[in-house]
Amino acid sequence: MELRSGSVGSQAVARRMDGDSRDGGGGKDATGSEDYENLPTSASVSTHMTAGAMAGILEHSVMYPVDSVKTRMQSLSPDPKAQYTSIYGALKKIMRTEGFWRPLRGVNVMIMGAGPAHAMYFACYENMKRTLNDVFHHQGNSHLANGIAGSMATLLHDAVMNPAEVVKQRLQMYNSQHRSAISCIRTVWRTEGLGAFYRSYTTQLTMNIPFQSIHFITYEFLQEQVNPHRTYNPQSHIISGGLAGALAAAATTPLDVCKTLLNTQENVALSLANISGRLSGMANAFRTVYQLNGLAGYFKGIQARVIYQMPSTAISWSVYEFFKYFLTKRQLENRAPY
C-alpha cells in the first residue's frame, strides 16, 4: 500500500479524512481541503486509542534507558557510586558496573502501563479538543481548548500510569532492594499499602497538567506555523513534538523532582531531613527538596529530563500521527467502491 502523503491516492484519502468531498462540495476551504485534524466520524475512538497505544509503547520503550538515568540524577542523596555528570557517562557506567541490561530494569512495567494509558490519553484529547473547539472557537483552533483537553486527558492517563511510575522508579534506583516488578509490587503492597501506588498522584497531576497544557498548546501552535494545512507531514510532527516536549519538560522540572522523591521515598534523604516514616504531599516534598539542596535541588536532572522528553514527544507524536493516518486511510479505502 502506498503511504506517501504526496501520492494521488493518499491525497484523495487525506481530502476525505479532512471532510473534503470533491463530488459533494461541502467541507472544502480555499485550498481545497480542511485541516487534517478535522477527521470525520470514520476516525473512530478505536483508531485514536490504537494509535495512542502504539505511540506510548514505542515512546517509553525507546527512551527508557535515558529515563532510568534521569531518575537516578534526581536522587537527593545519591550513593557515591551512583553520581553522574552526563547521560552518556551514566549509561556507560551503569552497564559496566551493574550489567548491560540494568538500564532497562522495569521497562516491562512501563510498557504495560503506557499502552492503555496513552490509548485513553489520545482518545480523550482528540474528542475533548474537537468538542471544545466548537465551543470556544467554532471556525478554527483554540489554544485554550487544546490546553483544557490536554489537562482532562492527563487525569485519565495518570490514573493508569501512576502505579507503573512508582514501581519502575523504585526498580531504576541504584542498589534497589527489588529484583523484579512482581517482588516490588508485593513488597510495596505489604509494607506501605495500596495508597503507596498513588502517594504521588496529586503531585503527578500537579506536574503533568501544566506540562501537558504547555505541551499540547505548543505542539498545536507549532503545527499551525510549519504545517498550516495540517496534512500528514512526518517532519513537522517530529519537530513540533520535540520542541513542545523540551519546553514543557524544562518548565516543570521542579515538580518532577518532587514526584521522584515521593515515588522513591529515599531513605538517606529522608534521614538527613529528620523525617521518620513516609513522606507524603506536594508541600512536604517541596520543603524537603529545599531543605536538602536549596533552589538548585529543584532542577536536579533537568538536562536528562529535557534530553529524555524532546525525542520522547517527537517519537510519540510522529508514531501517533502515522497510525492515525494509516488506520483512517485503511478504513476509507475499505469503504471505497470498486
From Swiss-Prot:
State the compartments where it is located.
Answer: Mitochondrion inner membrane
State the reactions this protein catalyses.
Fe(2+)(in) = Fe(2+)(out)
* Membrane topology, from the record: Multi-pass membrane protein
The Solcar repeat boundaries are 43-131, 141-225, 232-326
Keywords in alphabetical order, please.
Answer: Ion transport, Iron, Iron transport, Membrane, Mitochondrion, Mitochondrion inner membrane, Repeat, Transmembrane, Transmembrane helix, Transport
GO function term, MF aspect, one: ferrous iron transmembrane transporter activity
| Name used for this protein in its record | Mitoferrin-1
